């Protein structure tokens, strides 16, 4: 970590906070304690997660968090190997990764999408057993005590580390209708700044494959690398989301000191959508649902949900990549009428987004040679979604056309659902929990996308300094 990199990282953090401050709805009501402690918590997470080996040289126990994190990342790699067994049974050799004997190469539909199905089944089992509830509550306790945020918003944002933007608010179902505008913004931003576990596993799968292909390392090594980085990005995004939400929409109302909790009836731990949430604002509101009856039922229902998500991802990628190709072709034809020749392999839309967002890329520490390429990734993420952007990143990794530092920063910066289509997803997902506030959710949508994007850029800036 050089002094110039450190200074540029500090400039990036200041720039991100300045952008948020410029768009704040009540600049005089910003709680700078929350911002300061949130940034400190994010830095603590980053140092222990990303630089644990260096910390261990000073005092061995300081390396334990990193070791634990690496262990979890290793479980992801083992999980992907297990997914390959199921994929190969259905798809034959098409389901075998490039590093496996008998593989026919890399096929997205038979090697990546099955990951979503299996991970959804696994998460359903963990919720049924009550494991995830304990983990989420622990994370929420840390976030709430450090930042001074309310129980409901802390719990929802913490849940977003593991589940998607429409599932996480379900753990605070009884509170949603009564959330303040600032709390609602925090809940929405938490969804925008993070990704769901199922798609995270799929990113680990195909980014690791492409990285191994480009560098010659074992596929497991590439997957371990991206598992650690994507898990780190998800954890770091929680305090970052609250920081940016509280700057853009500061708290202006009195918030009761409520510890939000989600519990279950008859000790039946289920997914957040089927758990009973205990309201503590004077009224106990039990939400009772016929959830999974046993582990097998939980696995089956999770797999069914995962299949729907996998099919949705496949359809979305086909549509968006085709539309981007159409736009690139149309714009390319238009500029050629004026005698302009585009660089080989570069689309007009990619170049336009790259140039527009190049200053942002420079601000967060991307090497000068890659700022337009990174800008294209970021623009694609906001206009389309992060899955499309990650496929472009994977192609760039396989081609060896971007520097290692750019790969690291892009991995963190793209790790979130902050895109325009997510506004509609949140209206449809959070709106039914608070029908009277659907209009307010829609009104906050663009700000939530901005906050989520800035949160991802903040984690990317820190990662770029520590890992650059």
Enumerate the language-model features and the residues they cover.
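Interfacial/capping segments of alpha-helical transmembrane domains
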Residues: 36, 47-90, 327-355, 369-377
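Juxtamembrane and boundary regions of transmembrane helices in multi-pass small-molecule transporters
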Residues: 23, 176-177, 201-281, 427-434, ...
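Alpha-helical membrane segments and immediately flanking helix-loop junctions
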Residues: 146-204, 291, 295, 375-462
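Hydrophobic core segments of alpha-helical transmembrane domains in multi-pass membrane transport
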Residues: 12-24, 38-51, 116-125, 193-205, ...
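Structural signature of hydrophobic alpha-helical transmembrane segments
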Residues: 2-13, 111, 347-349, 410-419
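Intrinsically disordered, low-complexity non-transmembrane regions of multi-pass membrane transporters
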Residues: 1, 62, 88-90, 250-306, ...
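Hydrophobic alpha-helical hairpins/lids featuring a short glycine-rich hinge
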Residues: 77-147
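Transmembrane helical segments that form the transport core of multi-pass membrane transport proteins
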Residues: 296, 304-398
């Amino acid at each position: 970590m050089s002094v110039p990199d450190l200074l540029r990282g500090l400039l990036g953090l200041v720039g991100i906070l300045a952008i948020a401050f410029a768009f704040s709805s009540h600049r005089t009501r910003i709680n700078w304690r929350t911002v300061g402690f949130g940034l400190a918590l994010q830095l603590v997470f980053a140092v222990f997660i990303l630089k644990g080996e260096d910390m261990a040289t000073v005092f061995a126990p300081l390396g334990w968090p990193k070791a634990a994190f690496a262990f979890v990342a290793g479980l992801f790699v083992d999980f992907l190997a297990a997914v390959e067994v199921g994929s190969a049974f259905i798809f034959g050799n098409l389901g075998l990764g490039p590093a496996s004997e008998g593989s026919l190469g890399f096929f997205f539909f038979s090697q990546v999408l099955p990951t979503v199905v299996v991970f959804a089944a696994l998460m359903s089992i963990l919720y049924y057993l009550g494991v995830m509830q304990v983990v989420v509550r622990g994370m929420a306790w840390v976030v709430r005590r450090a930042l001074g945020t309310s129980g409901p918003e802390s719990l929802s944002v913490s849940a977003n580390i593991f589940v998607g933007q429409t599932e996480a608010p379900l753990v605070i179902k009884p509170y949603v209708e009564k959330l303040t505008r600032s709390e609602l913004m925090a809940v929405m931003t938490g969804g925008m700044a993070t990704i769901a576990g199922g798609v995270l596993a799929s990113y680990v799968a195909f980014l690791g494959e492409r990285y191994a292909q480009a560098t010659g390392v074992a596929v497991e090594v590439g997957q371990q690398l991206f598992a650690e980085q994507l898990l780190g990005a998800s954890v770091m995004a929680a305090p970052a989301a609250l920081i940016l939400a509280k700057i853009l929409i500061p708290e202006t109302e009195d918030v009761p000191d409520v510890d939000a909790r989600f519990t279950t009836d008859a000790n039946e731990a289920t997914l957040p959508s089927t758990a009973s949430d205990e309201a503590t604002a004077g009224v106990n509101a039990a939400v009772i649902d016929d959830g999974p009856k046993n582990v097998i039922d939980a696995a089956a229902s999770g797999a069914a949900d995962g299949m729907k998500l996998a099919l949705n991802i496949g359809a979305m990628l086909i549509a968006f990549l085709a539309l981007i190709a159409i736009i690139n072709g149309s714009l390319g034809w238009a500029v050629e009428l004026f005698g302009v020749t585009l660089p080989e392999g570069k689309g007009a839309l990619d170049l336009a987004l790259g140039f527009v967002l190049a200053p942002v890329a420079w601000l967060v520490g991307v090497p000068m040679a890659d700022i337009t390429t990174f800008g294209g990734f970021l623009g694609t993420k906001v206009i389309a979604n992060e899955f499309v952007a990650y496929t472009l990143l994977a192609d760039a990794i396989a081609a060896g056309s971007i520097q290692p530092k750019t790969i690291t920063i892009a991995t963190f910066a793209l790790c979130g659902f902050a895109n325009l289509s997510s506004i509609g997803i949140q209206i449809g997902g959070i709106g039914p929990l608070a029908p009277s506030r659907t209009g307010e959710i829609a009104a906050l949508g663009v700000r939530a996308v901005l906050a989520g994007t800035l949160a991802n850029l903040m984690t990317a800036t820190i990662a770029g300094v520590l890992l650059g």
